[in-house]
Amino acid sequence: MRTPIRFPPTPLLLAALCLTASAAAQASDHLICKDATTPEGATQVGALQPLFRDCPRITDIDFTGRADGHKFYSGVYTGPPKDRSFYEQADDGVLMQRGGVLATVKTSSFPGRFPLLSGARPFYIEAQVATSSNHRDNFPAIWLMPIEHNARMEDVYEGDPKSFERWFELDIDEGGFGPGGHHTAISWSGIWPHYKKIQNPNPTSKVPLDRTQPNVFGVSYSPDTLTVRWWLNGRPVLEATQPHVPEIARRQNFYLIVSAQSHKNISHYQMKLLGVRAFVGDATTASGGATVPARRAKGSP
């Protein structure tokens, strides 16, 4: 019988063990990925149809960025995917080292297994995450981007000037900006690199948040009123509407990104994704026009 090799407890390993133990103690019976009820944020906007609900596993991640049929991809279109060394499996989720990314579409900006969130329909989406420390350098992020904003520039619309892009970015939460959550709705437009940015004011909560505990960050969206509302652990915390939520949002289709970023690369930390779930409602007629069709999922080379 081989004698097992014992490794010394490195700071990164200790952080991972503490994060795993904390989550197990606090959230083992409250994982959103095992909760079949409809959250209040979904009910408020009429997003009553479950779209997906998932407890992430390492086997769900594609590390090439291009394989069909995966739930998560380890990168986005702006750069190469992260390799397997950035990720670990925990009992209750996937751990990412600083620099890790999980996105629900391929790096080629084509859909994966999870459906996109159509801006023509009300929706609610939430993610349950925890970090290994509350260091201010940590920049854990949960956000939505339209799949149309890609290298093919599919966010250039008929009637606009050549290469003039328009898209809506919805940041469900970002860490390191203050003691509490940081929630932004951003209307982007223009020709690269001279983009115009319109963002909601006062996005940062002054209420301290312990990010080492499993927190549930959610956002609801209504295409009728072009209003978004952010939710923290089941309670509404902030709201935004036009001009920060632009009309172009109704024509776009959104995917989820969860990323363990850093403000100045000072702190080494891990971010755990424990679960995600999304709900949608019926398509609506935008501003008296025709119902905006949802983008169909399709494969890619």
Whereabouts are the PLM-identified features?
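Predominantly extracellular/luminal carbohydrate-interaction, adhesion, and secreted-enzyme modules
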Residues: 247-267
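Extracellular carbohydrate recognition
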Residues: 229, 264-273
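Localized edge beta-strand/strand-to-loop motifs within extracellular or lumenal beta-rich domains
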Residues: 213-229
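Low-complexity, Ser/Thr/Pro/Gly-rich disordered linker/stalk regions
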Residues: 28-157, 163-168, 175, 243-244, ...
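Bacterial N-terminal signal peptides that target proteins for export
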Residues: 2-13
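Glycine-aromatic-enriched beta-strand/loop faces of beta-sandwich-type recognition domains
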Residues: 153-216
